[in-house]
């Protein structure tokens, strides 16, 4: 769907393998997520990158004709463009020419809601602009970009100074936000609250699953990057109090600058006790492998141990029994724990939450001896901090409360009760 009749032309420069077709399909979805309709496509099967245009001269002429015919607002390249290539292509076609990186930034800018995500996007854009400006100046000095330095060296220096100062201010503000987040994470641990983070390739159904697990009714549109800021809600998994967090979706070959910019958002994932890596099993096996590899690469680079990851094969209602068996073998071959669900149909949710409970770290159980008055006072705190498995009448008139939770929290509750026995 287009927004206000806006359109974009997709250009894929070098198709050198089968995986490129999947990236092309993904680019179509990104274009639509940015609010454009795909007016036309131009493909070139070549490993050679023309230094001036990225694509061959003949393809440039085809592109000009396509632009004249379709009259798009802009042209989008799958391949990364160098500053001189974007400049030359724009000059030839008469419209703005961007690459996949800039398209993703545009989507992020449209969907940013929180102050943090807006700052992160601005930071990534400014760093991109600064690197491009440096290259533009080098090209202008060599006479390849006529008129670029028309404002004089003073104007260029002023631009550098402004952007550099703005980058420093944003980074300082993000450091403060990061510190507040880390303090919040520490308070959660102090309170004994287990944390579960939903991650996965964009479009896998994370937000649908988040809504099912937490009873929320959050924003779902099926487009890439519906979630940019983290959203957390408290709930219970089989009696255990947990905080479930929905995080930004991954994408293949996400630029390092964007990963760096969204560090504070991804930090929520690193701090989680269990990471649910959601996959769309209605994809082809090749697509599932590609998306799993891309997602695992981000998680491992963040320092997430594989033992904390639970693969969640979503959308099982969209595949046949034979296809599901094939997908299950694929997940099994990953060597990670996995479970199969349909978030939309609420199939397999009980098994999913049970698997999460089994993975929660440092669980111990203990028996607390409490008077009825003490239990009445402490019941809310007990339920907020751990699972209450059983309450029975003791021989001395006290109530024996069997609880299960984090080791340090259970030990603290035991100390307050004045007695207790750790069962395991």
Swiss-Prot record:
Residues 194-364 form the Hflx-type G domain. It holds the Pfam family MMR_HSR1. InterPro entries: G_HFLX_dom, GTP-bd, GTP-bd_M, GTPase_HflX, GTPase_HflX_N, GTPase_HflX_N_sf, P-loop_NTPase. It is found in: Cytoplasm. The keyword Cytoplasm applies. Keywords: Cytoplasm, GTP-binding, Magnesium, Metal-binding, Nucleotide-binding. GTP binds at residues 200-207, 225-229, 246-249, 314-317, 342-344. Its cofactor is Mg(2+). SUPFAM superfamilies: P-loop containing nucleoside triphosphate hydrolases. GO terms for molecular function: GTP binding; GTPase activity; metal ion binding; ribosome binding. Disulfide bonds: none annotated. Mg(2+) binds at residues 207, 227. PROSITE patterns: G_HFLX. One of its GO terms (cellular component) is cytoplasm. It comes from the Archaea. Monomer. Associates with the 50S ribosomal subunit. NCBIfam families: GTP_HflX (TIGR03156). Belongs to the TRAFAC class OBG-HflX-like GTPase superfamily. HflX GTPase family. GTPase that associates with the 50S ribosomal subunit and may have a role during protein synthesis or ribosome biogenesis. This is GTPase HflX. It comes from Thermofilum pendens (strain DSM 2475 / Hrk 5).
């Amino acid at each position: 769907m287009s927004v206000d009749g806006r359109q974009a032309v997709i250009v894929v420069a070098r198709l050198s393998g089968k995986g490129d077709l999947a990236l092309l399909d993904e680019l179509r979805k990104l274009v639509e997520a940015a609010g454009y309709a795909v007016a036309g496509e131009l493909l070139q099967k070549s490993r050679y990158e023309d230094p001036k245009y990225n694509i061959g001269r003949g393809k440039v002429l085809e592109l000009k004709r396509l632009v004249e015919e379709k009259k798009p607002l802009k042209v989008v390249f799958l391949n990364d463009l160098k500053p001189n290539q974007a400049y030359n292509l724009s000059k030839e076609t008469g419209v703005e020419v961007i690459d996949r990186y800039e398209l993703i930034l545009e989507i992020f800018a449209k969907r940013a809601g929180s102050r943090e995500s807006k700052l992160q996007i601005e930071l990534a854009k400014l760093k991109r602009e600064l690197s491009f400006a440096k290259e533009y100046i080098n090209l202008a000095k060599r006479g390849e970009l006529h008129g670029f330095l028309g404002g004089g060296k003073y104007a260029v220096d002023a631009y550098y100074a402004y952007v550099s100062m703005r980058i420093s201010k944003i980074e300082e503000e993000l450091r403060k936000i990061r510190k507040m987040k880390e303090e919040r994470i520490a308070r959660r641990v102090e309170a004994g609250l287990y944390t579960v983070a939903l991650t996965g390739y964009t479009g896998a159904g994370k937000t649908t699953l988040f809504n099912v697990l937490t009873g929320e009714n959050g924003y779902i549109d099926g487009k890439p990057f519906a979630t940019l800021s983290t959203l957390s809600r408290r709930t219970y998994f089989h009696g255990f109090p947990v905080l479930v967090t929905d995080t930004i979706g991954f994408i293949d070959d996400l630029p390092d600058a964007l990963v760096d910019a969204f560090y504070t958002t991804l930090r929520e994932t690193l701090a989680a006790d269990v990471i649910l890596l959601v996959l769309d099993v209605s994809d082809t096996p090749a697509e599932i492998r590609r998306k799993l590899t891309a997602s695992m690469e981000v998680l491992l680079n963040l320092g997430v141990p594989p033992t904390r990851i639970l693969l969640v094969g979503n959308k099982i209602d969209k595949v046949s029994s034979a296809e599901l068996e094939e997908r299950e073998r694929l997940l099994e071959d990953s060597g990670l724990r996995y479970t199969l669900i349909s978030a939309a149909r609420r199939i397999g949710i009980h098994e999913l939450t049970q698997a999460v409970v089994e993975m929660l770290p440092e669980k111990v159980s203990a028996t607390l001896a409490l008077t009825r008055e003490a239990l009445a006072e402490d019941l809310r705190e007990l339920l907020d901090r751990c699972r209450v498995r059983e309450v029975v009448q003791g021989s001395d008139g006290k109530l024996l409360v069997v609880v299960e939770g984090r080791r340090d929290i259970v030990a603290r509750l035991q100390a307050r009760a004045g007695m207790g026995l750790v069962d395991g």
